[in-house]
A protein has these predicted regions:
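A conserved beta-strand element that flanks and buttresses the S-adenosyl-L-methionine
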Residues: 102-103
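Conserved acidic residues
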Residues: 99
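Hydrophobic adenine-recognition pocket in adenosine-nucleotide-binding enzymes
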Residues: 106
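Short, conserved loop/helix-junction motifs that constitute active-site signature segments
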Residues: 124
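Class I (Rossmann-like) S-adenosyl-L-methionine-dependent methyltransferase catalytic domain
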Residues: 1-96, 110-117, 121, 131-197
């Protein structure tokens, strides 16, 4: 994630939280949890406000959470009630630790040329047969928009990046869907959602 994007979240943490914390997101959260055993270990990767971590904890899952923004980490720690780690995406360095990784509207801030490395890190961090949920704004735009860097993806764009990350054994897309934005007044904005294994 570039410094401009981190600065955006550090300076707008409260405003961002007020616009996302109470968004009804259980359809996506439960779809992800449907692939996991009860009590599984989850990493909320780029956790933002901590909304999803709080939900997963309430359902009895073991949750670790991280975010690159110092201010978002403070908010997420309060929201989720756990110690949230301040960490950049490229600092993930775990091996077979998690049953599931939830990267909701987070790694879309990574430039496309750096995404293969991020997916390699995600693949290494999940256990054998573990799953990873990712979401990206739907499309082909890449660059700065409203003070943040975005990489928008289509199904084809995601598959190219997954193949580039590991040509011999890429993540398999086990579930994929297009959704509208869950925030009020933004239903016309489309999102690519995928569950990888």
């Amino acid at each position: 994630m570039n410094n401009t994007t981190l600065d955006y979240y550090n300076h707008n943490a409260e405003r961002f939280t007020s616009g996302t914390l109470d968004v009804q997101f259980t359809a996506v959260q439960d779809r992800f949890l449907g692939y996991l055993a009860p009590g599984a270990r989850i990493l909320d990767y780029g956790c933002g406000s901590g909304r999803d971590s709080r939900y997963f904890l309430s359902k009895g899952y073991q949750v670790e959470a991280c975010d690159g923004s110092e201010e978002m980490v403070k908010i997420a720690t309060k929201t989720a009630g756990i110690a949230v780690k301040q960490m950049l995406f490229e600092e993930l360095d775990e091996t077979a630790r998690y049953d599931g990784i939830f990267a909701c509207a987070s790694i879309l801030h990574v430039p496309s040329k750096a995404l293969p490395d991020i997916f390699r890190r995600l693949k290494r961090a999940v256990k054998k047969d573990g799953i990873v949920y990712v979401s990206f704004k739907y499309g082909t735009f890449e660059g700065e928009r409203n003070g943040r860097y975005f990489t928008d993806l289509t199904e084809e764009g995601l598959q190219k990046i997954l193949t580039a990350a590991d040509p011999a054994h890429p993540f398999v897309v086990v579930d994929q869907w297009i959704s509208g934005d869950a925030r009020p007044g933004r239903a016309d904005e489309k999102w690519l959602n995928a569950i990888l294994q």
